[in-house]
């Protein structure tokens, strides 16, 4: 004690008291300051919450925070120059989940749902609103029941607003989505890179860290909610125009992509929704996975018919053989189990049956939990609508190589639009806007038009990964699809395609498709001659592990090029696309869902228009289907409004399609080969869509147009591709081959509308194998197709039928032995029944009326569609001789000779045509129009 007391003697005592008082004062000061900060923060939070509730949680321009400088969007080089190959590099990492939730997040006052905003239709005024995410409990086979990640939450200042909310209106076919903000672009114009914005929270404890904080909310019941924070360092998002601030894309880098890849999330106009709808799923990587070694031989063979083998001497395959496996990483929480994909090593390249998908994962797909409940697909709600909408399909149908699992999980269609670098929002053509050629460049644009038969100059100005508006009908984003959809191989065939158009097609697939569903993208080069499509294309595509290039060593044409791609495809489903398209958001899953439900369904997207002059993206009518008119001319026909109203057809209803356009569709690979693929006897291009459409429908399959799948396509007035032979004759030959195999007796209707086709005597090749294939598949007749698939097509077998009357005499033509005579009319007499066919024969059974050579009297000859001496013109002669409309003119002679009746002798003969002679005027009992 004495030692202690001496410190408090004299001046030491004063210093001790001063020190103690200072410490106490400092403690009180810090406590007061902390209370002050808490009150200020609480007030700010309350004001912020009230303001966001009033404005729909929109972030104003003054609230944007800078994340990192953005790089200028890469442009395709002119004339095929190489593009940037270093920007597509990123390091594959596994998402880590750690518990770090503060009080505000647990109460949910600054949280909002991700990726689940309701789609806004372009055809009806719709109020944009946020829908809650609630999914049933999930489980995996062989494991305890675990709740599935049901929603993602982010903090307040995470996205940016580019425009104000607008109402949407009805848009007819061919109407551009953006009629304003046209751009005039010059080659020397410099574009400023848009600012990037920080994905962070003012209230989060990690606000100062350079990391993305996303809260995963797991619902165990309606009253309790647990959350975890997923922290992924050094990750940014693509510059994505999105509808709501709730929407965000969760991405993952690959080892093949390097560390300099930047992703960034942006907000755009209310009608634009370019984001991944991942709020209700396990975190899904958007990386490009490596491709396994290509098998030496594809197991699928060409069905009966000419086998088309592409040997090593015919095809050069450019590929990246990078293997991979998947592994799982569990979230360290007793109540949560999240499974993520992890790259390990070489892939076995084997297909895992869907029945095992709950315990095993495909090499290219992450593992997924399986839902306990059975939610109903939205597209199955509207069925059997007057033969126009698709019929409901039960799960009894089997997918090739796999059975549909008894209780598969489902999720909402993912709305993915991930770019490799931030988009330049002011770039020409961005968001599908029209572009105007600068006055000084019009001559150059005209000269370059012939390179692709569209505005190549503007195509090169537009970014290869431009944004386009989400044109899907309202409700598409809320539709459910199965978690274990089959993988698909995208097959694009091209020859001398425009560089920018080809790149834009590939980027649209990569940017807007769930990566685990894309097994590969096969670019089949049908012996292009352009230099930029050789080494430069190989170099550019080398940055995408899933893109492979197949080079044919000679020109085969589109049909055989597609067959080459199909033989080398490894996916469960084949998806054929043209090389000048732009796939819209959410395009792929609805197609695969239909094939998943029934392997004999062929799913087609709604094909929208990319204007060939200003490159604007234009929407089309929702209620269109592919049809044909005689002689097999493909076209689009809108379902009449009264039929739509009567049957209650909705914009999201699937449409039964009698004939598909042929350029864009998905088909089960094994079913494609069961059908015999394309007829290998078809040359180059033309008629293949008709042949496959008839084959699918008549042999037990279905063709559907899926309104929730949209793909833009450049429609050109002329085909720029060269044909080994005459283009028109090649197409006509293909159509004749199709007609001879599939149209049965209705082929006369085909020839009647293209009479020159039968006269030319085209060599269509051997049809034996195709006819045997039809018998083997036990296909229906063409009459069945007309009655059940395309009943609104007018297809009378003959032009006219019944009794054959002379107008002046009132007598009818009759058969006596093998001669033709005039008698009193008797409609019940078989001897007076005649048909006037589409190939201009007057038939009685298998006999045809014709003049006896050099005599002029008429008799019967065996019918032969190719014998011009049996053909007569009736009513069709009005085109060049309107005064002879009621006459029957014999074709074979140069002089106009007409059939004339002589009642006194009861005979018929040929005489010089006389428009005023009443005995030369005839009429059939019934006439049929088309």
From Swiss-Prot:
Keywords: Disulfide bond, Glycoprotein, Glycosyltransferase, Golgi apparatus, Lectin, Manganese, Membrane, Metal-binding, Phosphoprotein, Signal-anchor, Transferase, Transmembrane, Transmembrane helix
Glycosylation sites noted in the Swiss-Prot or TrEMBL record: 178, 198, 213, 287, 309, 387, 403, 568, 766, 817, 835, 902
Topological region Lumenal: 36-930
Cofactor or coenzyme needed: Mn(2+)
Region feature (Catalytic subdomain A): 485-594
Cellular component, GO, one term: Golgi apparatus
Disulfide bond annotation, renumbered to this chain: 476-708, 699-779, 812-825, 848-863, 898-913
Protein family according to the UniProt entry: Belongs to the glycosyltransferase 2 family. GalNAc-T subfamily.
Subunit structure: Interacts with EXT2. Does not interact with EXT1, EXTL1 or EXTL3.
Domain notes: There are two conserved domains in the glycosyltransferase region: the N-terminal domain (domain A, also called GT1 motif), which is probably involved in manganese coordination and substrate binding and the C-terminal domain (domain B, also called Gal/GalNAc-T motif), which is probably involved in catalytic reaction and UDP-Gal binding. The ricin B-type lectin domain binds to GalNAc and contributes to the glycopeptide specificity.
Name the record gives this protein: Polypeptide N-acetylgalactosaminyltransferase 5
Organism: Rattus norvegicus
Originating gene: Galnt5
């Amino acid at each position: 004690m004495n030692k202690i007391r001496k410190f408090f003697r004299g001046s030491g005592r004063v210093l001790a008291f001063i020190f103690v008082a200072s410490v106490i004062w400092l403690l009180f000061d810090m406590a007061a300051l902390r209370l002050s900060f808490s009150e200020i923060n609480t007030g700010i939070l309350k004001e912020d919450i009230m303001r966001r509730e009033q404005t729909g949680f929109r972030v104003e321009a003054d609230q944007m925070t800078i994340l990192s400088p953005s790089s200028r969007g890469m442009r395709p080089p002119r004339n095929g120059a190489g593009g940037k190959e270093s920007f597509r590099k990123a390091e594959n990492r596994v998402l880590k989940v750690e518990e770090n939730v503060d009080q505000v997040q647990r109460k949910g006052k600054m949280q909002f749902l991700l990726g689940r905003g309701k789609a806004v239709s372009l055809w009806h005024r719709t109020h944009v609103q946020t829908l809650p995410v609630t999914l049933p409990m999930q489980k995996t086979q062989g494991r305890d029941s675990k709740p599935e990640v049901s929603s993602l939450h982010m903090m307040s200042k995470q996205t940016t607003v580019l425009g104000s909310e607008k109402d949407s209106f009805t848009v007819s076919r061919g109407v551009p989505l953006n009629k304003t903000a046209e751009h005039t672009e010059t080659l020397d114009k410099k574009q400023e890179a848009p600012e990037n914005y920080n994905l962070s929270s003012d209230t989060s404890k990690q606000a100062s860290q350079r990391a993305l904080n996303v809260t995963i909310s797991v619902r165990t019941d309606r009253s309790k909610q647990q959350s975890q924070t997923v922290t992924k360092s050094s990750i940014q998002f693509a510059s994505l125009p999105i509808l709501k601030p709730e929407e965000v894309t969760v991405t993952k880098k690959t080892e093949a992509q390097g560390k300099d890849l930047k992703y960034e999330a942006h907000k755009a106009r209310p009608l634009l929704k370019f984001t991944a709808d991942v709020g209700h799923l396990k975190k899904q990587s958007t990386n490009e996975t490596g491709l396994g070694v290509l098998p030496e031989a594809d197991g699928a063979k060409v069905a009966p018919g000419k086998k088309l083998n592409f040997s090593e001497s015919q095809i050069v395959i450019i590929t990246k053989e990078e293997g991979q496996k998947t592994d799982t990483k569990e979230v360290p929480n007793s109540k949560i189990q999240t499974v993520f994909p992890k790259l390990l090593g070489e892939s076995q390249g084997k297909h895992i049956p869907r029945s095992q998908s709950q315990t095993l994962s495909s090499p290219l797909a992450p593992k997924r939990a399986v839902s306990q409940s059975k939610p109903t697909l939205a597209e199955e709600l509207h069925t059997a609508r007057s033969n126009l909408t698709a019929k409901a399909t039960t799960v009894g149908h089997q997918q090739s190589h796999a059975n549909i699992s008894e209780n598969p999980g489902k999720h909402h269609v993912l709305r993915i639009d991930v770019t490799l670098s931030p988009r330049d929002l002011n770039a020409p053509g961005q968001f599908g806007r029209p572009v105007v050629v600068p006055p000084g460049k019009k001559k150059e644009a005209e000269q370059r038009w012939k390179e692709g038969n569209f505005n190549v100059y503007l195509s090169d100005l537009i970014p290869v990964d431009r944004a386009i508006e989400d044109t899907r009908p309202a409700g598409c984003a809320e539709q459910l699809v199965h978690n274990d959809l089959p993988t698909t191989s995208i097959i694009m065939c091209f020859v001398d395609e425009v560089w920018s158009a080809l790149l834009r097609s590939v980027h649209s697939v990569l940017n807007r498709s769930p990566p685990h569903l894309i097994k590969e993208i096969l670019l089949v080069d049908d012996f292009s001659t352009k230099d930029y499509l050789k080494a430069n294309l190989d170099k550019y595509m080398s940055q995408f592990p899933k893109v492979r290039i197949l080079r044919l060593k000679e020109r085969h044409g589109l049909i055989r090029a597609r067959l080459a791609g199909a033989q080398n495809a490894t996916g469960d489903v084949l998806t054929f696309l043209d090389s000048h398209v732009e796939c819209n958001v959410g395009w792929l899953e609805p197609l695969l869902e239909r094939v998943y439900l029934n392997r004999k369904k062929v799913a087609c997207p709604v094909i929208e228009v990319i204007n060939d002059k200003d490159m604007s993206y234009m929407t089309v009518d929702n209620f269109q289907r592919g049809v044909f008119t005689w002689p097999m001319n493909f076209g689009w026909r809108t379902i009449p409004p009264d039929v739509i109203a009567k049957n209650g057809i909705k914009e999201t209803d699937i449409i039964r399609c009698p004939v598909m356009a042929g350029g864009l569709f998905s088909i089960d690979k094994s079913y494609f080969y069961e059908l015999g693929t394309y007829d290998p006897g078809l040359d180059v291009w033309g008629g293949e869509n008709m042949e496959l459409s008839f084959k699918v429908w008549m042999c037990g399959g279905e063709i559907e147009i899926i309104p929730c799948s949209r793909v833009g396509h450049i429609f050109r007035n002329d085909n720029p591709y060269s044909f080994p032979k005459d283009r028109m004759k090649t197409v006509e030959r293909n159509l004749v081959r199709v007609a001879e195999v599939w149209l049965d007796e209705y082929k006369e209707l085909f020839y009647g509308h293209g009479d020159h086709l039968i006269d030319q005597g085209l060599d269509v090749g051997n049809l034996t194998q195709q006819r045997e294939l039809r018998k083997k598949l036990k296909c229906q007749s063409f009459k069945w197709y007309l009655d059940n698939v395309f009943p609104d097509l007018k297809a009378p077998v003959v032009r006219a039928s019944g009794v054959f009357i002379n107008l002046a005499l009132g007598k009818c033509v009759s058969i006596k032995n093998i001669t033709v005579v005039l008698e009193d009319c008797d409609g019940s007499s078989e001897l007076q029944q005649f048909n006037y066919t589409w190939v201009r024969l007057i038939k009685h059974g298998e006999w045809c009326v014709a003049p006896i050579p050099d005599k002029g009297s008429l008799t019967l000859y065996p019918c032969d569609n190719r014998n011009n001496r049996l053909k007569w013109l009736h009513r069709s002669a009005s085109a060049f001789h309107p005064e002879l409309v009621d006459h029957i003119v014999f074709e074979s002679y140069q002089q106009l000779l007409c059939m004339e009746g002589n009642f006194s002798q009861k005979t018929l003969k040929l005489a010089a045509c006389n428009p005023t002679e009443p005995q030369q005027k005839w009429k059939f009992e019934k006439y049929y129009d088309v």
